[in-house]
């Protein structure tokens, strides 16, 4: 008797073997085995039918389990590799430190309702609301914490190309732009009623952003909106009046994206002319042109001050710029499959390669250590600015098709103001420490992505 099986298990196995030998038409072998195994002689047809197929089922179950074990072992190796490539040595510390959090599959929520590809997403600055825009002409408002659709906003007659929340303090608005040549403003506090339509562009409006307010020299009190268009221009709008207050010309082709600096003093744009351009938001005058990409520049982003120390080190500088300064470093993503990091004077610092298709969106980690990218190769990649821009994580199964957009949820609290004019080293050090502590305290570890596969996904800790 086997030491592994109980008497009952051994009897069940023997009967299953006899039934199997009967199925394969080996009666002599079955009879010989019955005698050798001391199986009772009353192994009738009813008993045989009971055990027929049992051995095959057990065998295939074992094969399936072996396959599953191999898959889990492979997954374990992948996770271990990710673990080893991450800088913090303590798993507990990594889980508790928002400044080191990176997205991972699977997504917390997959939001489905759009009928055409997703083009854009945007987080409400206070509430757990997320807006998504689509080629189906609609905007959908979701509760990203619950993963539920709250409402569908209709008004555009062609595809929605970008959305953004912002506006004067205490009066958050949602702005959207479209291939129908218009920008629309919606009031979240009044069931997303369309309160204003801004015509003026002569072609599709590709991107919009509210211009932040509050900094010395900022042209905005929270009521300005900047738009980029296929008509080769940028326009600045006053959302309280609906008037276009400035038109900025300089690009030679379609302007694909625009991003304001955190203090609203600078605007960064890029497009089909394969350049990115930095503009003074007050005067509309160009400050710098970034030349180096070999194809359309799809997306741009301006580095937050919390990343200055890491980017200055990447640039070979001993001392970072003051935290009060803006547009010191930028990043651009292109159809040439590369990401380029520049300083604010147009000097190329680093080219990041690894994506296999167009770069569609860039986001600096609010902790200042990473740059994240989304691409038509269906992945999200995380680049470590403290490791020479090395790709330390790839979310390979982020979506099932081109990842068209990505946004990071805004911080819970505002950054602590710092005195950028201080020249004393200790004072600057204290300011930097306060800045980092405030940034960490406010980081929400939540990312939203949109895709051609009609899905919006929420990646969260």
UniProtKB/Swiss-Prot annotation:
Coiled coil location: 60-87
Protein location: Cytoplasm, Cytoskeleton; Cytoplasm, Cytoskeleton, Spindle pole
Region (Disordered): 79-98
Polar residues bias: start-end ranges: 79-93
Gene Ontology MF term list: dynein complex binding
CDD domains for the chain: WD40
Domain comment quoted from the record: Dimerization mediated by the LisH domain may be required to activate dynein.
Protein name, UniProt field: Nuclear distribution protein PAC1
């Amino acid at each position: 008797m086997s030491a592994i099986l109980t008497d009952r298990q051994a009897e069940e196995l023997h009967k299953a073997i006899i039934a199997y030998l009967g199925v394969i038409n080996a009666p002599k072998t079955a009879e010989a085995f019955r005698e050798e195994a001391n199986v009772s002689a009353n192994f009738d047809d009813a008993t045989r039918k009971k055990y027929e197929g049992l051995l095959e089922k057990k065998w295939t179950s074992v094969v399936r389990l072996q396959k599953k074990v191999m898959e889990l072992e492979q997954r374990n190796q992948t996770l271990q590799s990710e673990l080893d490539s991450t800088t913090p040595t303590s798993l507990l510390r990594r889980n508790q430190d928002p400044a080191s959090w990176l997205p991972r599959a699977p997504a917390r929520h997959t939001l489905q309702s759009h009928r055409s590809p997703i083009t854009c997403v945007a987080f409400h600055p206070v509430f757990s609301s997320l807006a998504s825009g689509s080629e189906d002409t609609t905007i959908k408002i979701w509760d990203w914490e619950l993963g539920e659709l709250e409402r569908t906003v209709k008004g555009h007659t062609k595809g929605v190309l970008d959305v953004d929340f912002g506006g004067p303090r205490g009066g958050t608005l949602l702005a959207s732009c479209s291939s129908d040549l218009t920008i629309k403003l919606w009031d979240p506090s009044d069931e997303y009623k369309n309160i204003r339509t801004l015509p003026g562009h002569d072609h599709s409006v590709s991107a919009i952003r509210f211009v932040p307010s509050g900094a010395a020299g900022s042209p905005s009190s929270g009521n300005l909106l900047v738009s980029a268009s296929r008509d080769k221009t940028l326009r600045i709008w006053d959302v309280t009046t609906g008037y276009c207050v400035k038109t900025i010309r300089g690009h030679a082709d379609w302007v694909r994206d625009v991003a304001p600096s955190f203090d609203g003093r600078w605007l960064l744009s890029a497009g089909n002319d394969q350049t990115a351009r930095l503009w003074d938001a007050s005067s509309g005058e160009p400050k710098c042109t970034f030349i180096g990409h070999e194809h359309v520049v799809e997306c741009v982003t301006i580095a937050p001050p919390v990343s200055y120390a890491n980017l200055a080190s990447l640039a070979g500088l001993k001392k970072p710029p003051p935290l009060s300064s803006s547009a010191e470093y930028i990043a651009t993503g292109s159809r040439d499959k590369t990401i380029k990091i520049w300083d604010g004077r147009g000097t190329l610092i680093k080219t990041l390669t690894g994506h296999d298709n167009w770069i569609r969106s860039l986001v600096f980690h609010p902790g200042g250590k990473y740059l994240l990218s989304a691409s038509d190769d269906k992945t999200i990649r995380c680049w470590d600015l403290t490791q020479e821009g090395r790709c330390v994580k790839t979310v390979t199964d982020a979506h099932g098709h081109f990842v068209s957009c990505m946004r990071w949820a805004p911080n819970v609290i505002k950054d602590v103001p710092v005195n950028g004019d201080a020249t004393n080293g200790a004072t600057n050090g204290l300011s930097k420490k306060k800045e980092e502590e405030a940034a960490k305290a406010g980081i929400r570890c939540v990312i939203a992505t949109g895709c051609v596969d009609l899905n919006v996904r929420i990646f969260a800790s």
